[in-house]
Amino acid sequence: MSFTEHPLRRWAVDEMRLRRFAPVAAHSEIYQVVRLIEADERNAEDRWLINARPDFDDWALAPRHGSGHTLGGIHFLWERHTEASTLTLIFPQETPEPARHNYIQWLENWPGGVVRATQIRIMPSAENIDAELSAIGISTDEMVCCDINAGIRLWSDFSIHGDGYGRLLITAGDLGEGERGRIIQRVQELGNYRNLALLGFPVVQQYGPQLDQLEHRLSDHARRVALADEDEEIALLFDGS
């Protein structure tokens, strides 16, 4: 390796490593929530994950990730990061509303504070885009549209709606369910990690000026020590000013 690697680089890569996403059908809906889980909430999360879950026909659980699947096509994904957990539900479009209810309630009552919550609707084509935008509640006044890959196009107003969710509307594109899922996963990871990173900004804004003052005082003190003679230097070393 010809360059010096930051000691935290490997940790950051492992933290952001994309676990395989579930397949996403061309006409489906996704609910994803990222929650900040405090250390004293981890046991509550484990109990909720194991004991409160709705019915799944297939269920697999490891220390940092888990998944569930029903014969009706509902997928659940859970991934534990260092400070947060990502929860994902994927519903086929034909899933009746009563069948969705228990799964969504389970997701919404999860322990921890919500950092990001997104409702994603995948549609086969953009043929009825105006009606779809209206149905999902995306404001055309604030809307952004972009092409991603292989015919996948995304619309969003990047705002939090009355139910607490952001909204994404995505065309299915010309690719398989597995690759579509991986692309949607990558798009979501960008927003999820951005929100997690921004959580530190208020602390920086609050304590940044104090750190600047301390830095100036330390610099001034070092300058005075450098210019002082031996007796003055000893006095300055014990000077708290």
Per-region residue spans from a language model:
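N-terminal pre-transmembrane cytosolic regions of membrane proteins
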Residues: 1-125
